[in-house]
């Protein structure tokens, strides 16, 4: 039986016609598939770039806020010194309160900006990882398709045919 499966012409084998059908399919739709995948990856890249640009903008905004807070802090210090010259202890207490508030506000804003930047970076990294995982899965599928040969296919088919009577008996029972 195995000898019969290995003899004959190339035209008699099913794997030849499957290969021909796959090649014809790829000839007709290969560019469209590659184009669609390329478009999808370009869109994902643009989205990631947009998020990175947004993160950079937020970082610049945070730095501007920090500079603004520092300038307000310096102004508060100058005001506190003037009040210290006029009112002594009361001005000293007021300056400490303003300084603490400005520093806390600056820290909160800086922390919020850092969290936004970190979240945007994490999202971008996750999207890149997802794209890499999908690409690896497609590559593994292609490798598996290329490594399974005719002898392995015949063995699986013979095994399935051999198991049909037992499966039919179980189904009938």
Swiss-Prot record:
UniProt key word Membrane: yes
CDD domains reported for this sequence: ATP-synt_Fo_b
GO CC term, one of those recorded: plasma membrane
Membrane-spanning parts: 15-37
Membrane topology: Single-pass membrane protein
Similarity field: Belongs to the ATPase B chain family.
Protein name, as recorded: ATP synthase subunit b 1
Origin species: Acidiphilium cryptum (strain JF-5)
Taxon lineage: Bacteria, Pseudomonadati, Pseudomonadota, Alphaproteobacteria, Acetobacterales
């Amino acid at each position: 039986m195995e000898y019969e499966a290995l003899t004959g012409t190339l035209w008699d084998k099913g794997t030849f016609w499957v290969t021909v059908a796959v090649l014809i399919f790829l000839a007709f739709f290969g560019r469209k598939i590659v184009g669609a995948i390329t478009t999808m990856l370009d869109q994902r890249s643009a989205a990631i770039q947009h998020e990175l640009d947004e993160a950079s903008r937020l970082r610049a905004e945070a730095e501007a806020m920090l500079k603004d807070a520092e300038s307000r802090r310096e102004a508060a210090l100058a005001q506190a010194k003037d009040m210290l010259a006029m009112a002594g202890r009361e001005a000293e207490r007021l300056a400490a309160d303003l300084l603490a508030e400005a520093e806390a506000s600056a820290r909160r804003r800086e922390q919020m900006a850092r969290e936004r930047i970190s979240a945007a970076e994490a999202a971008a990294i996750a999207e890149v990882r997802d794209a890499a995982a999908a690409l690896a899965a497609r590559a593994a599928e292609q490798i598996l398709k290329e490594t399974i040969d005719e002898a392995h296919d015949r063995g699986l088919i013979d095994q399935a045919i051999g198991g049909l009577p037992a499966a039919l008996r179980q189904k009938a029972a």
